[in-house]
């Protein structure tokens, strides 16, 4: 470790121990070095004994700064790793920090743009509209058309801080499999790698711009979701320029009610937006917390969501989508056998998993959920229960599903905050069943043919040549097989002859030895020489 890394590591240890987080170290033999090492820092003790463990963990991460705050936010979605009291506290972490100087923001934008700010913008406001750990936002107008825009600018010098802390996280992750019996299955280095990728993606605002453009295209003219326009000509890796929006924060229930918003429809549309993104588009906004969601002031009886901050997105492949949809439907039909089979078929748990045992475990954990009214059952907690059960059957962490679960919990919490009577299953079931029907049968075949038509139209003129090449390759392959067969037969014949010669040679050698012991020297010499010669010829035939 470098001196800088050692200083940072000591700071992390000091903060963790001052909040009593050594309580998280399990009392098992493998962690004995950690527990012994804890006594080396005898002067550091828990100064927050009046607070719960989850709250102390949250406060410690806040004290360590933005990189650890974001890590805690991501880990709050890993409810397969943490008990609810800790995960709930981590979910309260707020990514809000003081804004940096507006003059510095202006300078940073001008460096990125390659000229004076006034070349492209009027009315730049040096006072930040919003500020977070990675970036902050300022308002302005486009000089060419006077449209109101926001400029998102990355914090100067944030990259070295992120890289230094992530390097330390990798080192710490390397210790986890050695100290925890379940550490290897949790794939801690992969968790850190996923977190690093998320952070670095957020640092590249061109990626966020591309995500926003894709989402806007997916929901063009949609009555459910509006994504602000991105002015890509003005975007740089550290600067994002997009349309300024005006709306009611989705968490401001009083303002929405005063506006006369149809809260039931708004809540249902949140669910529909999520499932449309996941199953129709395979591309979903994965940071849909209330700070990134607004509701348009226009037509409150037919409410429209406005989504911002598209830095984090997720996607599922076709197989994952199918298994996920079938899992939900099988679960709500209480077909636990099918749920178990789907987990095995998808590869989420090992192929040699005992399906009967797995089914029984799922039934034991999930059946009590149905003691609640159907409208009160949480999709997110259904996934959580399934993943926690599958974990006992060596299910490896699926990062894409973790991101989906986090987003689903956001959507559920938001929907029930807007309309407590929201029946998520009634809203989602028709969508899931319709999507599954579209994946099979003649319509699915026709759609697949349409999708592949351009490819085959391009390849069709080359078809005769491809057929000829295939026939030639088949002919050459056949000749190679015949040649190889002859070689193998010859080799087998030589090996048979060699075995015969080895047998004859061994017999002659043994006979010669017996004759030699009987003082028949001349005869024994002939036998021994003949035996050695037979062995030599046999050896040569094997070469």
Swiss-Prot record:
An individual GO BP term: ubiquinone biosynthetic process
Domain Protein kinase: 123-501
Biochemical pathway: Cofactor biosynthesis; ubiquinone biosynthesis [regulation]
Active site: residue positions: 287 (proton acceptor)
Keywords: ATP-binding, Cell inner membrane, Cell membrane, Kinase, Membrane, Nucleotide-binding, Transferase, Transmembrane, Transmembrane helix, Ubiquinone biosynthesis
Segments traversing the membrane: 517-539
Domain of life of the source: Bacteria
Disulphide connectivity of cysteines: none
Gene Ontology molecular-function annotations: ATP binding; protein kinase activity
Gene Ontology CC: plasma membrane
Protein's cellular compartments: Cell inner membrane
Pfam families xrefs: ABC1
EC number: 2.7.-.-
InterPro entries per record: ABC1_dom, Kinase-like_dom_sf, UbiB, UbiB_bact, UbiB_kinase
Keyword ATP-binding: yes
Annotated binding of ATP, by residue: 129-137, 152
Its membrane topology: Single-pass membrane protein
Family recorded in the similarity comment: Belongs to the ABC1 family. UbiB subfamily.
Function noted in UniProt: Is probably a protein kinase regulator of UbiI activity which is involved in aerobic coenzyme Q (ubiquinone) biosynthesis.
Protein name, entry field: Probable protein kinase UbiB
Highest classification ranks of the organism: Bacteria, Pseudomonadati, Pseudomonadota, Gammaproteobacteria, Enterobacterales
């Amino acid at each position: 470790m470098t001196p800088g890394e050692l200083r940072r590591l000591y700071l992390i240890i000091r903060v963790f121990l001052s909040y009593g987080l050594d309580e998280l170290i399990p009392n098992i033999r493998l962690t004995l070095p950690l527990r012994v090492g804890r006594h080396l820092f005898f002067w550091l003790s828990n100064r927050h004994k009046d607070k719960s463990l989850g709250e102390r963990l949250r406060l410690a991460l806040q004290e360590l700064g933005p990189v650890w705050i974001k890590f805690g936010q991501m880990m709050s979605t890993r409810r397969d790793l943490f008990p609810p009291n800790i995960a709930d506290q981590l979910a309260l972490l707020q990514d809000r920090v003081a804004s940096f100087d507006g003059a510095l923001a202006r300078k940073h934008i001008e460096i990125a743009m390659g000229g004076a700010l006034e070349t492209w913008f009027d009315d730049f406001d040096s006072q930040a509209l919003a500020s977070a750990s990675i970036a902050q936002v300022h308002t302005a107008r486009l000089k060419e058309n006077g449209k109101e825009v926001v400029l998102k600018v990355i914090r100067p010098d944030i990259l070295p801080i992120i890289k230094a802390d992530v390097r330390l996280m990798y080192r710490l992750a390397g210790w986890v499999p050695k100290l925890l019996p379940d550490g290897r299955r949790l794939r801690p280095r992969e968790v850190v790698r996923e977190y690093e990728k998320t952070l670095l993606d957020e640092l590249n605002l061109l990626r966020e711009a591309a995500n926003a453009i894709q989402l806007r295209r997916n929901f063009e003219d949609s009555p459910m979701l509006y994504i602000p326009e991105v002015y890509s000509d003005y975007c740089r890796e550290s600067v994002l320029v997009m349309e300024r929006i005006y709306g009611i924060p989705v968490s401001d229930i009083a303002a929405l009610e005063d506006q006369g918003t149809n809260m039931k429809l708004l809540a249902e549309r949140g669910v529909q937006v999520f499932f449309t993104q996941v199953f129709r588009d395979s591309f979903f906004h994965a940071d849909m917390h209330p700070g990134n969601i607004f509701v348009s002031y226009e037509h409150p009886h037919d409410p429209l969501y406005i989504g911002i901050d598209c830095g984090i997105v997720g996607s599922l492949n076709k197989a994952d989508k199918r298994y996920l949809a079938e899992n939900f439907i099988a679960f709500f039909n209480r077909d636990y056998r099918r749920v178990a089979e789907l987990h095995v078929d998808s590869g989420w748990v090992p192929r040699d998993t005992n399906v009967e045992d797995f089914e029984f475990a799922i039934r034991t954990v999930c059946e009590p959920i149905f003691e609640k009214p159907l409208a009160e059952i949480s999709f997110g907690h259904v996934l959580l229960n399934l993943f926690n059960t599958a974990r006992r059957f060596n299910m490896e962490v699926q990062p894409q599903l973790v991101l989906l679960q986090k987003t689903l919990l956001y959507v559920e919490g938001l929907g029930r905050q807007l309309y407590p009577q929201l029946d998520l299953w009634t809203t989602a079931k028709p969508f899931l069943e319709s999507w599954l029907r579209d994946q099979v049968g003649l319509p699915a075949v026709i759609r697949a043919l349409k999708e592949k038509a351009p490819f085959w139209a391009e390849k069709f003129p080359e078809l005769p040549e491809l057929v000829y090449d295939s026939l030639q390759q088949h002919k050459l392959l056949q000749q190679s097989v015949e040649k190889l067969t002859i070689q193998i037969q010859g080799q087998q014949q030589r090996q048979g002859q060699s075995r015969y010669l080895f047998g004859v040679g061994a017999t002659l050698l043994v006979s010669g030895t017996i004759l030699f012991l009987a003082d028949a020297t001349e005869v024994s010499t002939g036998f021994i020489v003949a035996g050695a010669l037979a062995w030599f010829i046999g050896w040569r035939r094997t070469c």
